[in-house]
Amino acid sequence: HWQYDLIPYSTYMLSLYLHIPFCQSKCNYCAFSSFALAEKSDQITQYISALKEEIKYYSQHFHHEGIKTIYFWGGTPNLLGADQLSEIIFTLEQHFDCSNLAELSFEFNPYPEEEIYTIVKELQKTFWKKYPRIRFSFGIQSFDNEVLQLAGRHTRFLGLVDFLRNLQPLKQDNTVFNFDFIAFGKWNQSKKGNPYLWTPSALQFFTDFVNSQFADSFSLYTLELFENQARKRKKTDSLISGAYFRSDEQIYEEFSLLKDILLDAWYHRYELSNFSLSVKSSIHNRTYWEMENYLGLGLNASSFLNKKELNSEFFSSLGIPTPEAGLRFKNTNSLKNYCDKQFLDPTAFEPLNEKDYLIEEFFLGLRTDKGVPQLSKFTSLLIPH
């Protein structure tokens, strides 16, 4: 029996997503709202100041809500360091009720190694007594050196091996370690023409690492390419344009191979791209798939309020009528506008009626192990036969 977590919480609570858009450099496959920042600058200070103001703004409308989860993503949140990340969390604690927080999550890169270890230790020291779960997700992405190079990553296989081995002493009882991988679809060929993934030693290390069950969970994604991505702007580079990143079939074959290794090691597939040991699944990510309430804070962050939490006062302040069943909305994607405290994108409000809501609930349910348990509520949407 797979329990989703051991922490009681209300589905009426709010989850908070905080977007940190700064990166050491932009990865070639990345479609997220982020940009390279060579070193810490006034932009980070200005951004944190604006983020604090946005926190205060939402607390005026949702002060009665308890906060269920807090999730830092980007970008590369570890560029801020432990002190600035803690500063943002302290601001959240001042303006929201975080006393029943179920999960505090951070997305980090696995480099620079010593800096990451220091940040993890400092965040654990600051918050391990406050919150029942601190989740760190590390973007490993691949164990293939050529893929890592072409993708614009700043580490290679042996560096990742060292990172994972040296990370082990930092594990605590209330710490969850998640590791992200992407199926890029690059297969090598042996002299006999047989395809193989990565190198034999890299694939064996992955298998041994998974079987050790040091990792609490894995996220396994497939490469997706969009018109605005850096890779699309490098069509003149033959290596990137087709030599390694090939067909959807090859991408799926890599995904399938890695997926089977995870399943054989008793990681439970609780969502299409996510696998975990018992009670170690991401509490925050389930809020998306189960259409619970969340606010996105920061540049280009998305929010959703469902029909259980339609705050008419909040909608009045936006100058829009209260939606029938829910509302999706986004922040501006202009860093200048955001730092000038113009947070919301006025063109990105998507009200949901009852039919819209049911359609989203149905298809999001298909993504998870919970499925669509009450099929009868969707009969009005289903086509006969």
Name what the model sees in each region:
Residues 34-61, 67-260:
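Conserved non-cysteine loop/helix-boundary elements of the Radical SAM core domain that shape
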Residues 233-314:
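A C-terminal junction/extension of Radical SAM enzymes
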Residues 12-16:
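Extreme N-terminal starter segment of soluble prokaryotic enzymes
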